[in-house]
Each structure stands twice: as C-alpha cells, then as structure tokens.
Amino acid sequence: MTKKPYTTWQVGKEEYKLKLTTSAVCKLEENLGVNIVKIFNFNDDFPLPPLKTMLYVLHGAITKYQHGLKFDDVMNIFDEYLDEGHDQMDLLMEVLIPLMQDSGFIPKEEKKAEKVKVLKQ
C-alpha cells in the first residue's frame, strides 16, 4: 500500500488535504520563533499548544492543496469542527499529530521505537 503524501481533515462535507512542506515549516518557525517539533513536545507534562499556534500550523499545511485560504478561513473551519462535537484535543490527536508524522517531522511510534533501539546499541 502506498502512503498518501498528505493527511486529511474531514469537517462537515469537506475533506481538506494537509501537508507541511519545508517552505511552510520554515515560515512557521520564523513567525512562531520556535522549532515546529518543540510545539508538539510532550515531555513537558503534555502541555496543549495554544489554539492560535495549532491553527497557524493548520493554515501552513492546508494551503498546499487548498490555495487561497486565509487564516480567518481556517478559524471558521475550526469553528465548524467544534460545532460537530470535536474539541481542541481532538484537533491535536486526530489531525495535527498525524500531520506531523505524515509530513516527516515526528516519527510514527513504530519508527520511534526502532530509532531508540538503534541508539541504545
């Protein structure tokens, strides 16, 4: 099975394709002043990133396939996502973490375990 080059975010009847490109990540890191992996660092007692930061990451990822969407559009899409009964934690666990994994910025669990095993040898 071939891996899709993007993550999907289903909101209402719309399916948004998400992909963090190197260019998008560089812009995000410049604007946020922090490494993108640090945003999702779960070693600090699992802090939930600020909503605005999470939406900036979404905006950076959504514009690869949905050209012309503005940050306000992403906020409106997130409002619809909330209206469907989701919450900010759902966005993190069901959308952003898979996005970071599929885009190659954090390892999937099985790859992470392999890397740790190699490092311990």
Predicted regions, residues:
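Residue-level signal for threonine
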Residues: 21
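Charged interaction scaffolds used for protein-protein
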Residues: 1-10, 15, 30, 34-46, ...
